[in-house]
Amino acid sequence: MWKVSALLFVLGSASLWVLAEGASTGQPEDDTETTGLEGGVAMPGAEDDVVTPGTSEDRYKSGLTTLVATSVNSVTGIRIEDLPTSESTVHAQEQSPSATASNVATSHSTEKVDGDTQTTVEKDGLSTVTLVGIIVGVLLAIGFIGAIIVVVMRKMSGRYSP
């Protein structure tokens, strides 16, 4: 009877392996552009004052790029309309005139759709992998607890034969 349980366990986990393969991610800067890039010259980012060296026209070529801070001073004198942030952040910055930009580097991609330019913020795949790991862990825990309950119930009923 344990062969059936092992077979069900292997088949169940194989379906989870297929789902986990779809959650794999590539390098975080594969399809991103620096927002301050004009004419192939790297300019400091508006929100984090960071230059991305190595950005070129061939952006699909794989390679490692590093972020280099150009200054440690906070960014002032930037119009709020130029920053690619959500509306809740924009309202918070308008209410507080002494708000400064944080020194957090984010990835922004600029896409052109029907002549309009859309800026989106891309998240890394770590949250997806974490969520898949939690789901797999919970399912495995339920399976182990169920197997223990089945073994205990069989032993109590007298039908258990090792």
Swiss-Prot record:
The lineage of its organism: Eukaryota, Metazoa, Chordata, Craniata, Vertebrata. Belongs to the podoplanin family. Residues 85-108 have a biased composition (Polar residues). The gene is PDPN. The keyword Electron transport does not apply. Residues 1-22 form the signal peptide. The record marks V150, V151 as: Cleavage. GO terms for biological process: actin-mediated cell contraction; cell adhesion; cell migration; lung development; lymph node development; lymphangiogenesis; lymphatic endothelial cell fate commitment; negative regulation of apoptotic process. This is Podoplanin. It comes from Homo sapiens (Human). Residues 154-155 are annotated as: Requires for interaction with MSN and EZR. Highly expressed in placenta, lung, skeletal muscle and brain. Weakly expressed in brain, kidney and liver. In placenta, expressed on the apical plasma membrane of endothelium. In lung, expressed in alveolar epithelium. Up-regulated in colorectal tumors and expressed in 25% of early oral squamous cell carcinomas.
